[in-house]
């Protein structure tokens, strides 16, 4: 009996509709030139890690719940006396999502988390890096449905970087608009 493989909703939509729309808009010569999502990197910097070394572990547990994948604890590369940071001190957590988990996270981010952000007026359309990647920040991690608001003792912020295979910002912006990213006008 053949095993049925799960395919995320947004990936099905990309294959069925978004690729054709981008091909029509930019008229690529080759199908492999059509931009697609490469990876999503989520980073949590924990500023309070200098006072309490257990904070990055707590942040990593929350990040694991949000991403559905075990994060890596990040360490300081060098000492900074002004911030009371020593070399190799744990200062945050990060996770890189690819494949099905990436599409599932993107679905939750766009349809559930971003509408729950307080005073949200849309994403900044200038947050592209010039090479087709988009970066954004979220100030409170409780906007994700996986986090129980009653059990949270501290709010964490996070950086979310969406990496695409697009070569220009216009191509990446068109790709993310097709995925319903709410860019402000």
From Swiss-Prot:
Q: What would be one Gene Ontology cellular-component term for the protein?
A: ribonucleoprotein complex
- Give me the disulphide-bonded residues: none
Listed InterPro entries: Ribosomal_uL5, Ribosomal_uL5_bac-type, Ribosomal_uL5_C, Ribosomal_uL5_CS, Ribosomal_uL5_dom_sf, Ribosomal_uL5_N
Q: Does the keyword DNA damage apply?
A: no
| GO molecular function, a single term | structural constituent of ribosome
Q: Which UniProt keywords apply?
A: Ribonucleoprotein, Ribosomal protein, RNA-binding, rRNA-binding, tRNA-binding
| Statement: the UniProt record of this protein carries the keyword Cell inner membrane | no
Source domain of life is: Bacteria
BP terms from Gene Ontology: translation
Q: Which Pfam families match?
A: Ribosomal_L5, Ribosomal_L5_C
Q: Assembly and partners?
A: Part of the 50S ribosomal subunit; part of the 5S rRNA/L5/L18/L25 subcomplex. Contacts the 5S rRNA and the P site tRNA. Forms a bridge to the 30S subunit in the 70S ribosome.
Q: What's its job?
A: This is one of the proteins that bind and probably mediate the attachment of the 5S RNA into the large ribosomal subunit, where it forms part of the central protuberance. In the 70S ribosome it contacts protein S13 of the 30S subunit (bridge B1b), connecting the 2 subunits; this bridge is implicated in subunit movement. Contacts the P site tRNA; the 5S rRNA and some of its associated proteins might help stabilize positioning of ribosome-bound tRNAs.
Q: Which family does it belong to?
A: Belongs to the universal ribosomal protein uL5 family.
Q: Per its UniProt record, what NCBIfam families does this chain match?
A: PRK00010.1 (NF000585)
Q: What is this protein called?
A: Large ribosomal subunit protein uL5
Q: Organism, per UniProt?
A: Rhizobium rhizogenes (strain K84 / ATCC BAA-868)
């Amino acid at each position: 009996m053949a095993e049925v493989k799960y395919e995320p909703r947004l990936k099905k939509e990309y294959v069925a509709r978004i690729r054709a729309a981008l091909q029509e808009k930019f008229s690529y010569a080759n199908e492999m030139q059509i931009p697609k999502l490469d990876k999503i990197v989520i980073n949590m910097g924990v500023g309070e890690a200098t006072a309490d070394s257990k904070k990055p572990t707590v942040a990593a547990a929350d990040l694991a719940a949000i991403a559905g994948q075990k994060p890596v604890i990040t360490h300081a590369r060098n000492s900074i006396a002004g911030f009371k940071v020593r070399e190799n001190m744990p200062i945050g957590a990060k996770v890189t999502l690819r494949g099905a988990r990436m599409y599932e996270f993107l679905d939750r981010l766009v349809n559930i988390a971003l509408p729950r952000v307080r005073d949200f007026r849309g994403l900044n359309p200038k947050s592209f890096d010039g090479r087709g990647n988009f970066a954004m920040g979220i100030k409170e991690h409780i906007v994700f449905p996986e986090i129980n608001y009653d059990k949270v003792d501290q709010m964490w912020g996070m950086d979310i970087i969406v990496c695409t295979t697009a070569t220009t910002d216009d191509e990446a912006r068109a790709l993310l608009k097709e995925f319903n990213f709410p860019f402000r006008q």
